[in-house]
């Protein structure tokens, strides 16, 4: 079994035309997990939260702003707890990011952004591959999302998790061949 096999299997089993890695919630017992409107885990940690609502809008929250009952009442459909948030909700790059200095350096990355309700941008940046790609800093990733017209954007799990799938194939060059993931974000075919 090769790395990424679980990722590809999840995509195939869900009839995904497109998929990107999620927040790798399976790597932590303390996190927020809302999938398809069902709250599975509600343990706020020190990471930002991104919520996709049933009306197609997307909003990011700092740990101190996040209120589980309020987002469920507002129609939370999916929630990812990794981050950080990249944009301020008006398309502007944040001046500081809620993360450690290490995570701010150039790395393979994946992000989800929202231009308007139901209009999303997904980005995966390869990295740690000398002569091919060094990756992106959070500021660089945020600038990409802003340049693409996103109002809000969120950094998903990166590193070996940064994978993008389209039409039955992984279409990027994941660091170390990728890793098996607990979750993906997908668009059905």
Region annotations inferred by a language model:
Residues 1, 21-24:
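Acidic carboxylate-rich catalytic motifs and surrounding loops in phosphoryl-/glycosyl-chemistry enzymes
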Residues 2-7:
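Short, small-residue-biased leader/transition segments that mark boundaries at the very start
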Residues 11-12, 146:
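Non-catalytic positions within long, well-ordered alpha-helices that form the structural scaffold/packing
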Residues 12, 24, 117:
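Residue-level marker of positions within ordered structural domains that often coincide
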Residues 15-18, 183:
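A generic secondary-structure signal marking the coil-to-beta-strand transition
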Residues 17, 21, 153-155:
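Alpha/propeptide regions of enzymes that mature by internal proteolysis
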Residues 23-103:
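Active-site-adjacent helix-turn-beta-strand microarchitecture at beta-sheet edges
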Residues 28-45, 51-52, 96-151, 156, ...:
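Conserved, well-ordered active-site substructure
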